[in-house]
Every structure is written in C-alpha cells, then in structure tokens.
Amino acid sequence: SQKSITNAVNVGTATITVEGLGTYYSGEASGTFTITPAKVEDVKVTADAKTYTGKKIKPTSFKATLNGNDVTDQFKLSAYGDNTNAGKTAGSLTIALLSGNKNFTGSTVDGTFEIKARKVASSTISVYDKYGQMVNDKYDTATVAAANLKTFTYDGKAQTFASAKLNVGNVVLETGESADTNIAKPTADDFELVYVDNVYGKSTQGATYNTAHVYAVAKEGGNYTGTKTITTADGTVIKNVVADLTFGISALKFVKENVTVKNGVYAGGVAVKPEVIVQFGGNT
C-alpha cells in the first residue's frame, strides 16, 4: 500500500513510497515521478464586483484557481482595462506569474468582473406647455391643491405635455448622496421618459379625475438603475423607475350637439332602437 508521497506539490520530481501488507508481503519500495507544468490559460480569474463611478476602476483584489484549487499567491495583478462603464463583464484585468514560477507554462491570463450600475433613489421631473413654460404648479397632483389643479380632458387620445425632462441635477443616489464630483454626473441620455395610463387614466379613490403618470426610467444596460418598480393599469411592469410626476385626466362632458340620432325603420311591431352617434373633435 502507499506509505508516503513527498515533493508532490510543485513542478519537479516527486517520490512515492509503498510498503507490503499481510503475511506474505513485507518491506517497502520507493519510486519517482515527474510533475510537469500546467498551462496558465487553464487558470480562472475572478474579482469582486465594483459599482460604477464614471472613473477607471482598479480591482483591489483577485482570485486565481486551477481546477478549483486556489493558486492566487502565484500571481500578481499586471494590468487592468478602462473599466468605466457598468456591465456584467465590463471590468477586465490581467494577472501575471510571479518571477521564477515554474508551475505553469505561459505568463499571463485575463479575466473579467462585474461593474454594477449605480442605484438612483429619487429625482424630479419638469413638464412644459407649448410655450416652453413649466407647468408643474398647475398639473402635478402631488403638489397642487385639488381646487387649483388643472387636468387634461379625456378625448380618446394619449395625453402628453408639450415636453418633459428629468432634472438630472436633482438625482439622489440610494446611499443618500447626490451625484457629485466623486461620481460621474448622470445625463439625460442615461434615462428615458415613459407615459403610463395616459389615455383613460387610472381610477383613484376620492378623486374627481383619473390619474396618469410620466415616469423617468433608467435605461436598461446603462450606468444607472432605479430602485422602484411600478405596475400599470393593464398589468405592465416597469422597472428601474427613478422619478414620477402624476397628473389628472377628467371625464369628458358632452352636450346635445355632440350626439346624433338617426331615424329608425319600422320593425314589424317591435321596439325600434335608433342608431346613436357621439362625436368629439372628429372622434366617434
């Protein structure tokens, strides 16, 4: 049976010793065998995830494994990539064998690591009329008293403001800090504006109008991400919401001028139902 193996960890010559067992076998014998270098490209490199800063990120540590065994102490960090944008494998690094290492053939191996999008806790949205005037103080249901609130009127079409924008200067990160000089300031291109429930609106208990929304949403795969998820009236789920402006849509009131009744034709003694047409602004 095997008694011992010596010098069998690193590249070189190792010795194995076996001994006899039982009544008819006694003594021991030794032999040698050679351990050859592994290929450095078979080493897997991982590094801890980092969070987007807008600046070049240097990995602070890494782990190198060969067949699941830790060989980190045989390597050093030799280079790293631009590492400025967020992504699952957006970060890159290169490790090199320490001087004099004979356990591997080759010299360097590359790896990747995740750069996480930075979370935005909140911001604000400004909306404007066709004259370029900000009208939050007329339409925003969160800040305008019901008696003074101006609403859109239902007409069967999607209701939108002349323009809307996310106030990137008001972005607050999940950590509670603003996007200051330590973090690349977000731009409007990092987000998109989405109107939701803006045809009929969504019924709101106690309100005389239905509610619709303009949401600012962090773009998928970008450097920022939202912390809120909302569900629309039709069940659509929207993730990564960073800001919301709620506005009202009032029911349409019509008068007799909006209604046309066509004459009916005798139906043989049963009640005749005339055709009734209701029109608003050319829409039936």
Mark where each language-model region is.
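Solvent-exposed, low-complexity, repeat-rich "mucin-like" stalks and linkers
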Residues: 32-69, 114-179, 250-283
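Serine/threonine-rich, repeat-prone extracellular segments and beta-strand-based repeat modules
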Residues: 1-26, 67-113, 172-233, 238, ...
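Non-catalytic terminal and connector segments of soluble metabolic enzymes
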Residues: 30, 110, 243-244, 250
